[in-house]
Amino acid sequence: MNKLIRRAVTIFAVTSVASLFASGVLETSMAESLSTNVISLADTKAKDNTSHKSKKARKNHSKETPVDRKEVAPVHESKATGPKQDSCFGRMYTVKVNDDRNVEITQAVPEYATVGSPYPIEITATGKRDCVDVIITQQLPCEAEFVRSDPATTPTADGKLVWKIDRLGQGEKSKITVWVKPLKEGCCFTAATVCACPEIRSVTKCGQPAICVKQEGPENACLRCPVVYKINVVNQGTATARNVVVENPVPDGYAHSSGQRVLTFTLGDMQPGEHRTITVEFCPLKRGCATNIATVSYCGGHKNTASVTTVINEPCVQVSIAGADWSYVCKPVEYVISVSNPGDLVLRDVVVEDTLSPGVTVLEAAGAQISCNKVVWTVKELNPGESLQYKVLVRAQTPGQFTNNVVVKSCSDCGTCTSCAEATTYWKGVAATHMCVVDTCDPVCVGENTVYRICVTNRGSAEDTNVSLMLKFSKELQPVSFSGPTKGTITGNTVVFDSLPRLGSKETVEFSVTLKAVSAGDARGEAILSSDTLTVPVSDTENTHIY
């Protein structure tokens, strides 16, 4: 009887796995790798301990070959409904299907049961991930009668029990117990399947940005003196403010160095609590009151504004500088700096600072303190309507565009006054292209070769362009080949090279012509060089003795 039960349990386990495969829960490769491990039957205490026949039967049973086991999954003895002394069914054993997908399902049934006495079937579903709409289907044994289930359900026409779980979280377990009553002897086969939809949850954090703007600026300022405003922007909300933009129209009577009438500052995204500061500087052009208004806007929010009103007083100081627009390198250039007080206030502690670009050398600046490329004049007082003039003599060592910046600072009852000016001079270099011609073999025998080498060098401070070279040889020499930075052409006893587009300052290029001595005599080779800088072509002659 025990052997029969062992075989029945093994068939049941395989049938359960097959049912899972047929329901689509298991893939073929997974089903092939599954195995069933059945807990051996617990020894049941014989009712007649004195029966020798029973002992012999158990002894013979222990010598039988173990049932061929196809291990599918770990087998666990159920602790929920273990065998009791007065129960009509054996210990529970569990068949577990390992599935790393959505839901893991196990089924526990007794090793044996008694006809006419109910026995339990325990189904446990474990969430491998968050799932919804979990449907568990239990196929009732054919030769058994449904008694009850927990949770309660009603069998379908084809003998199936169906439970629906709205949601099964990851790691969460759901247990179902079904009681059935076997109607006749034999094996009661049962199978359970599960279907589930994986659940994905997303979280969107909602908040409200709140952009505030404040502005700081002077109450009084002087005409033509810089007026600086600080615009402070802060996000006092709970969410990120997107695409924050600050617009600051230039007030009437003000000018900005960019020449624009509306200044726009793109701050991008601002996190909660983030603070930004913008500094704007204007130059007042007329007296009176001027109000600077800054407006901040952001995506989906209201615009906020902040304003500061400044009273503009009389002008304080003016400065200008004049000099040559262009000059040649190493040629002195004089700049004239003019400082004046067009207002009605006395200027005190006037400082005139002239800063020259690197590469420019100060040659002379009367009454000034010279330090490297900086020249400074100081004046104790500059009365209204009074003007001062300073001269500085400079020279550039290299070609290029250099700017001379002048800043005047002073104090008055109106406060600190500053004015600035600049002058730019373009310093040009001068190209100086030279040529040198030599022959490598002299004298040479008739039939031998010699090479004429022509070196072209730009010794000047500027590049030369369209540099062309032509060579003419007497009848004693016959050009054979040539080389150089450009292509050439041999026509009779003349070699012409294509123009070189550019010859940089201090750059040298070399041309060479290989010649064959064809007759004895005092041969001559003439090189003619021309370029955009050379108004008249330059020629050089080399002689070669042929014997």
Swiss-Prot record:
Keywords: Cell shape, Disulfide bond, Periplasm, Signal
A GO cellular-component term linked to this record: periplasmic space
GO molecular function: extracellular matrix structural constituent
Any one Pfam family match given in the protein's UniProt record, by short name: DUF11
Record propeptide residues: 23-40
Biased composition (Basic and acidic residues): 62-79
Keyword Signal: yes
Annotated region (Disordered), positions in chain: 45-84
Secretion signal, residue range per the UniProt entry: 1-22
Alphabetical list of InterPro entries matching this protein: Chlam_OMP6 (IPR003506), Chlamydia_OmcB (IPR051172), DUF11_rpt (IPR047589), Ig-like_fold (IPR013783), OmcB-like_DUF11 (IPR001434)
Gene3D superfamilies: Immunoglobulins (2.60.40.10)
Basic residues bias locations: 52-61
Localization terms from the record: Periplasm
GO biological process, one term: regulation of cell shape
Assembly mode: Part of a disulfide cross-linked outer membrane complex (COMC) composed of the major outer membrane porin (MOMP), the small cysteine-rich protein (OmcA) and the large cysteine-rich periplasmic protein (OmcB).
Function text: In elementary bodies (EBs, the infectious stage, which is able to survive outside the host cell) provides the structural integrity of the outer envelope through disulfide cross-links with the small cysteine-rich protein and the major outer membrane porin. It has been described in publications as the Sarkosyl-insoluble COMC (Chlamydia outer membrane complex), and serves as the functional equivalent of peptidoglycan. It is present but the disulfide bonds are reduced in reticulate bodies (RBs).
Name recorded for this polypeptide: Large cysteine-rich periplasmic protein OmcB, serovars I/J
Source organism of the structure: Chlamydia trachomatis
